Amino acid sequence: MAFRGRGGDRGGGGRGRGGGGGFRGRGGSRGGGSRGGDRGGSRGRGRGGDRGASRGRGRGSSRGGARGGFGPRPSKFNDARLADKDEDGSEEDDISEDESNVSEEEIEGSEEEDEEGEEEAQSGQPYMSLLKSFQSATKSKKRKLDHTEEEGPNKATKTEDDDDSDDEDDDEEVKEDVDAVDEPEEDPQDAPLEDLFDEDDDLDDSDPFETHFAAPDEATFQARIKAVQANKWRTDRIAQNSNRIYYNTPETGDSTERKLPHSISGVADLKLKKKLAESMAKHTEFDEAEKAVAPLLFNYQDMLYCNRTVASSESIRRMACLHALNHVFKTRDRVIKNNTKLQRDDTLELRDQGFTRPKVLMLLPTRQSCVKMVEMICEVASPEQQEHRKRFDEGYVDKSTKFSDDKPEDFRDLFSGSDDDMFRLGMKFTRKTIKYFSQFYNSDIIFASPLGLRMAIGSEEEKKKLDYDFLSSIELVIVDQADALLMQNWEHVEFIFEHLNLQPRDAHGCDFSRVRPWYLDDQAKYFRQTVIFSAFNTPELAELQRLHCHNWAGKARLHPEYPGVIQYLGVKTRQTFSRFDAGSIAADPDARFAYFTKAIVPTLVKRAKDAAGTLIFIPSYLDFVRVRNYFANNPDVASVTFGNISEYADTPEASRARSHFLTGRHRVLLYTERAHHFRRYAIKGVKRVIFTKSEQSLMLEHGLGTVKVMFSKYDIMKLERIVGTKRAGKMITEQGDTFDFV
C-alpha cells in the first residue's frame, strides 16, 4: 500500500532565507545567480514562527535542509534502532544486503525520486530548499572554482578593481540580484495628461470605487469604523449554492447594511474602465467560481475564499487581476485629471491619493505563480509595450519539465516552473506600457513572496534600516494560494500585515494637500480591502482575517459544505478515528502526545513483530521531534525499530529510511507533513497509517491496510474535509470517542 496525501492544516512556522539586517545569511549557487542586492546579498535563514520551532520548507536536501529561524541547523539525529544490526559490518554493507532482497521493480520508484531530487539540486532553483550542510556547501563552492579554472581562456581579463572578487568567500557571497532596481523615486502625482487610460469616463456615483474610496459618505464610514474599533460585528450565515458564507458587518444598528452585494453574472454587471471592458468583451459570462467571488471582490469587501482548486485557479486570477487593474486605472486617471485642473486653478482642494503610489499588493508563493499572475494582467490590460519583459522572462520563467505525470495535479501546479520563493517585483502602468522592475515607490502593483518582501523591508534588529513606507497606501491586498504560504514561514505574512497602512516615516515627495483625509487620520487600514484565496480554511487564515481585516464595508468567509474525501477513496480500507479530550488549544499538544503514548504505542509494542509497515504521519515538527525522541530514548519501545523522514532529511537520508522501511528493517517510519508537502514521496511497504492529527485529505493506493486518526475538538476544520461537514459535527459532540469507517 502506497501513501499519498496533501498537506492540510499547517504545523507551523516556515522556513526563511536571511538577507539584510540581522538575518543570518548563507551563500550558495542558484543556477546562475542568487538573491543579493538590497536584500543583503546572501541567502540564509529567515525568522521562524513559534509554531514549529521556526521551521521551514523541506523538499529534501536538493531543496535545502534547514528551517527558517536563527541559529545553526540542528545536529543530525542518530535516528533508528536497527533490527539485526551487524556490529562488524558497515552501515553501507547492511543496506546492500537488505536491498539485495528487494526486487528492482519495488525500489524503482524510490530511485527515480532520488534522481529527481539530485537533478533539482543541480538545477539551482528550489521552491524553499532546505539549507545544505556546511560540508556540502564547501563542495559546491569547490566545484564552482574548478569550473572557473577550466574556462581559462574564456574568462574576461581581470583588472585591479576585481581583486576582491577572487576571494573564495566573496565568490559565494556576492551574487547578482535579478530583482534589484536602481532608479530614483518619482513624485506620486507626476504624470502627463497623455497617460490617461480613458479620457472620457464619466463619474458614476454608484461605482463602488466612488462610494468606498473616492467619495464615501463620512457619516456612514465613521459610524462603521467606530463599531470596528469596538470589535462589534454582526455575523450572518448565508447558504449560497454549495457554499457557506459567513458575512460580517460592523454593528451600527442599521439592518439594511447586512445584505450581501447583488449577484454578478458577467462583465456587464461591473463598473469597469472602458479599456478593461473592451478587453474583457469576449469573456461576457462568468463561471461558478467567478460568480462566487465577484460580488464581494468588486464591492471592496474583505474576503476569505476557501474553495480554490487547480481547475478554478485561472478564473480566480482573472477576477483578481481585473479588479486590481480597475482600481489602479481609476486611481491614476483621477490623479492625472486633477493635475490638469490644478494647472488651471491652483486654489482647488482636490484630495485624490495616499502617501505613496503603490496601491495593490499581491502575495504569492513562487516565481511561477507570479508569472501566471503577470500573464493574466497582460491578457486583461492588453498593453502596447512591455518594458523590461525580457529581463522578467529570464528571471522568472522556467520552461523545463521537472515532474512526471504521476505526481498529483496540485503538486505540479504549485511547483512546476520556477519554484523559488524569494522574489519581489514592482510594476508600473501608463496608458500604453507596462514597466517591470519599477522602483517600489514608483510602482502601482507590487508582486512578492512573503520572504522576498520581508527581506526588502529589512530586519527588526536594525530598525534604522527598516523601510515599509511603500506599504503605507496599499488599498488592495490579494493573497493567492494561501494554503501554500502556510507551508512556508507564516510569520513573514503576519509581519507584512503588521506593517501595512502605517504612517510613513519620510515624505517621499508627497503633496499632503492632496492626501485623502482618512489617510491623514490614520484610518487607511479601515478602507483597505484584503482578499485571501485558499484551497481550505485553517486556524491561521481565520486568525489573519480576524486580526488584520478591518474593512468598514464588511468581510466574509466562503467555504463549501464538504461531503468528505473519505467516500472517494480508490480503495476500501478500515479507518478508525479516535477522539481525545484537550482542555484548551494550549493544552492540545500535551494531551495529544499523552494519548499517543498511552493508547497507540502500547499496541505497537505488544505486536512488535507485526508492527512492520507502520507509517506515523506527524504534521507539526515540534511533535515530530517529541515522538522521535520518545522512540529513541524510552525503554518501553526498545523493541520497535524505526526510521524518520522530516523536512531536514537530505536525499540519501530519505532514500535510506524508505529502503529500510520497505525491507522491514525499520518497522515504523516517522514522516512529517512538510516533508510530504515538498517531496510527495510514494512510500512503499505501508500496511497501516497512524495520523497523530487529522489531515486535509488522504489517498491510499495499491493494496489494503488500516488507518488510525487521532483528533480533538480543535481539529474540526481538518476533520470536516475528510469525513464531511455533517459527520464531523457529530464526531465532535457525540459521547463515543471511536468512529470506524470501512
Curated annotation (Swiss-Prot):
Primary residence: nucleus
Biased composition (Gly residues): 10-35, 61-71
Position of the signal peptide: none
Gene3D superfamilies assigned: P-loop containing nucleotide triphosphate hydrolases (3.40.50.300)
Record's GO cellular component terms: nucleolus; small-subunit processome
Region (Disordered), start-end ranges: 1-214
Residue ranges with Basic and acidic residues bias: 36-53, 146-159
Amino acid composition bias (Polar residues), ranges on this chain: 122-138
The entry's keywords: Nucleus, Ribonucleoprotein, Ribosome biogenesis, rRNA processing
GO BP, sorted A to Z: maturation of SSU-rRNA from tricistronic rRNA transcript (SSU-rRNA, 5.8S rRNA, LSU-rRNA)
One Gene Ontology term of the molecular function aspect: U3 snoRNA binding
Record-annotated membrane-spanning stretches: none
Cell compartment(s), UniProt: Nucleus, Nucleolus
A Pfam family that the UniProt record links to this protein: Utp25_C
Record's compositionally biased regions (Acidic residues): 85-121, 160-208
Highest taxon of the lineage: Eukaryota
Role played: DEAD-box RNA helicase-like protein required for pre-18S rRNA processing, specifically at sites A0, A1, and A2.
Family label: Belongs to the UTP25 family.
Summary of subunit composition and partner proteins: Component of the ribosomal small subunit (SSU) processome composed of at least 40 protein subunits and snoRNA U3.
Protein's UniProt name: U3 small nucleolar RNA-associated protein 25
Taxonomic path: Eukaryota, Fungi, Dikarya, Ascomycota, Pezizomycotina
